[in-house]
């Protein structure tokens, strides 16, 4: 797989993420919810000053400094792992993580928060209310899922070879 193709994956995630967030900020009032399906899928416009699942330090300025710093370090680390990896699956996952991290980093730098807008509700499933998320978050979760499955399968293959 060409290295440039993987950078295109990251760029695509960033562009799609920023495009959808711009549409949401421009067309859905903050806090408004638009029903897509009757029971479990909505678009909404929320500002996430925290991290995943709205984890926060309670102070917007501290959040911004900490999360921008941590994300910037994570992007550098993911880029290093991306360059080091020989596996197409790992490289694809790292490209997805990089795109998601950069997409949310842009929001934090530009606005001081991340725009979240996708809201699923799975009644009686683990949580009272599923967190609102965005394309960047989805890309990161997809990549981590891919890495976990790949690691499990790779572990099984290594065990079978021995």
What are these regions (language model features)?
Residues 1-162:
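Alpha-helical transmembrane bundles and membrane-interface segments of multipass inner-membrane proteins
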């Amino acid at each position: 797989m060409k290295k440039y193709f993987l950078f295109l994956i990251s760029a695509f995630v960033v562009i799609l993420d920023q495009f959808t967030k711009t549409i949401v900020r421009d067309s859905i009032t903050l806090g408004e919810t638009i029903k897509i399906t009757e029971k479990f899928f909505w678009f909404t416009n929320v500002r996430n000053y925290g991290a995943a699942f709205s984890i926060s330090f309670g102070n917007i300025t501290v959040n911004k400094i900490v999360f921008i710093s941590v994300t910037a370090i994570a992007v550098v680390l993911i880029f290093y792992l991306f360059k080091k990896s020989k596996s197409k699956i790992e490289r694809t996952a790292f490209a997805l993580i990089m795109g998601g991290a950069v997409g949310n980093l842009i929001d934090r730098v530009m606005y001081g928060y991340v725009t979240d807008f996708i809201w699923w509700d799975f009644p009686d499933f683990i949580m009272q209310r599923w967190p609102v998320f965005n394309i960047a978050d989805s890309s990161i979760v997809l990549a981590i899922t891919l890495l976990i499955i790949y690691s499990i399968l790779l572990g099984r293959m290594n065990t079978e070879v021995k």
